Amino acid sequence: MMEKTDETIPSREELAVYIEEAAVSVTNNYEEAPAVLMVDDAVIGTLGNFSASIGKAKSKKTFNVSAIAASALSGRTVLRYRSMFPENKRKILYIDTEQGRHHCQQVLKRILRLAEMPDDKVPENLIMLSLRKFAPRVRLLIVEEAIGTTPDLGLVIIDGIRDFLYDINSSSESTEVISKFMQWTDDKQIHIHTVLHQNKNDEHARGHIGTELNNKAETILQVEVDKEDKAISVV
């Protein structure tokens, strides 16, 4: 399948292929996107789509996505998250764009403990990448390559999306990143769940990327510290 990017102008032959690929027929049978992530009985994620967790700084967004990853890894209910990935979609790619390897290792161990798996043994279906040291453009390319070359991939966790951009308020950069999410999820039939901070003074996700995320994501989960007990976060 030809890659659809904004970097080159497609030839007429390529455009003809894209039109054929995008055509919707009234007689074809198109299956509904399979539900793969749920909170209790509410669907929050399907294959071919992406979702997000948003919240203020220190609201335990990473812990929240750790629970999602643990449920997908174990097939069990973890903190009310349930997962139903097909057998050929059991691989998880967890990408952290902010933290170094030591912190990422702690997150990895937490996921394994939540999944009730040993935290001193390499998990078969979970790959974690720390992309802190790379430039935004390189991070995006690394993720694209990892998604394209990981067999049996079903779930990609990206903590966080902001670090794919040089300017969080750039409309062109934001559109490019969200377009990549739509392309990857559709072409590979995976689910992507990402993380973004909220503004300090309101409930909106930060920057133009937050606006695009709100407009295009299948589900937005808001994570916030409990007003009665600061040690607890609620979704």
Task: Give the label of every model feature segment.
Residues 37-41, 78-82, 141-145, 178-181, ...:
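A generic local structural motif
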Residues 67-68, 103-111, 142, 146, ...:
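Alpha-helical scaffold elements adjacent to nucleotide-binding pockets in ATP/GTP-utilizing enzyme cores
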Residues 52-53, 58, 63, 172-235:
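Phosphate-binding/switch region of NTP-binding enzymes
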Residues 71, 75-76, 111-114, 164-167, ...:
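Conserved, well-folded catalytic cores of nucleic-acid-processing
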Residues 86-169:
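Conserved inter-motif catalytic segment of the P-loop NTP-binding fold
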Residues 1-16, 149-152, 226-235:
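C-terminal regions of RecA-like/P-loop NTPase motor modules
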Residues 45, 84-88, 119-121, 148-150, ...:
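Conserved catalytic network of the ASCE P-loop NTPase/AAA+ motor domain
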Residues 7-110:
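The Walker A/P-loop phosphate-binding site
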